[in-house]
Regions:
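N-terminal pre-catalytic segment of deacetylase/amide-hydrolase enzymes
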Residues: 1-18
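Acidic (Asp/Glu)-rich catalytic clusters
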Residues: 7-9, 34-40, 55-66, 83-93, ...
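Active-site beta-loop-alpha junctions enriched in small/polar residues
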Residues: 22-24, 49-53, 70-74, 138-140, ...
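Catalytic domains of cell-wall/extracellular-matrix polysaccharide-remodeling enzymes
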Residues: 111, 119-188, 193-205, 209
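C-terminal domain-boundary segment and adjacent tail
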Residues: 163-166, 232-275
């Protein structure tokens, strides 16, 4: 089988790297962080949380960028909340926002309401002018149960979009072969996904020098340091550190020394649609 690198005109063994700035729309600080990560740093794509409070503002600045939709059915913070953009009572908790945990969604969400909500999030991003390049799932909630995964896979097929799927043993813990199911439907997925709920700074050098053939996605959550960010989230320092790390020229030099070639999700999408 021809490798992705070969289909892009590169040697078969070339490590391909996507650096995705997740959390676009999550907050104003995240919008500016994603913008800087793509313009001044090594990020080649971003992920948009359509229901989040600053998503609409992001559309005015990022319409032409390589932006995917982070399908969102959770609002995990205690004080900073958002909710469905459709009528979806089963996707509300007692505070009137999305449930805080994946387990709450898995236990109580009506699958038809989830299907309508997720499709509406993609359609709204398109309505706002985004050329949607990929799908992912906030907190991976929709990827780790088969009935919810089917919703995302259906969207990926319908819209011709590649998708992020967890790696590193996640299939074993989920109990079903979600990666094979996606590939069987012709959906492109990265071979390795590197992400963390804390700063990736300490891992980046190791990750780069362990790159192998295929597509590796490095997921960061960049944000600028503001008083509002500090009030919104207990992990604000990790987000600021992600921005600093990805904008550090040393990271670009690491990729170059490792022989890696940076791509965006749009490249995977176009290959998928031509298949």
């Amino acid at each position: 089988m021809t490798s992705v690198a070969e289909r892009l005109g590169l040697p078969a063994a070339t490590p391909l790297v996507i650096v995705t700035a997740d959390g676009l729309g999550w907050a104003h600080a995240a919008n500016i962080g994603a913008e800087r990560a793509m313009s001044d740093g090594a990020a080649s794509a971003a992920g948009l949380m359509v229901p989040a409070p600053w998503a609409r503002a992001a559309s005015a600045r990022h319409r032409g960028a390589d932006v995917g939709v982070m399908l969102t059915v959770n609002a995990e913070h205690d004080l900073y909340r958002w909710g469905p953009i459709t009528h979806a009572p089963s996707l509300l908790d007692g505070d009137g926002g999305f449930p805080r945990t994946a387990e709450d969604v898995w236990d109580h969400a009506d699958i038809d309401e989830v299907r309508r909500e997720c499709r509406a999030q993609v359609e709204r991003a398109i309505l706002w002018g985004f050329d949607v390049t990929h799908l992912s799932a906030h907190l991976d909630t929709l990827m780790l149960r088969p009935e919810f995964f089917d919703v995302v896979l259906e969207l990926a097929v319908d819209y011709g979009l590649p998708m992020r799927l967890p790696t590193g043993g996640s299939e074993d813990s989920a109990g079903f072969p979600f990666r094979r199911l996606a590939l069987d439907e012709g959906v492109s997925i990265p071979d390795v996904v590197v992400s963390s709920r804390t700063s990736l700074r300490g891992q980046l050098e190791r990750v780069v020098f362990e790159l192998g053939p295929g597509v590796t996605e490095i997921v960061v959550r960049p944000a600028i340091d503001t008083a509002e960010l500090r009030a919104q989230s207990t992990d604000w320092a990790d987000r600021v550190d992600d921005l600093d790390s990805i904008c550090d020229p040393q990271f670009a030099r690491l990729l170059e020394r490792a022989g890696a070639h940076q791509i965006g999700w749009r490249a995977l999408r176009e290959l998928q649609r031509r298949s």
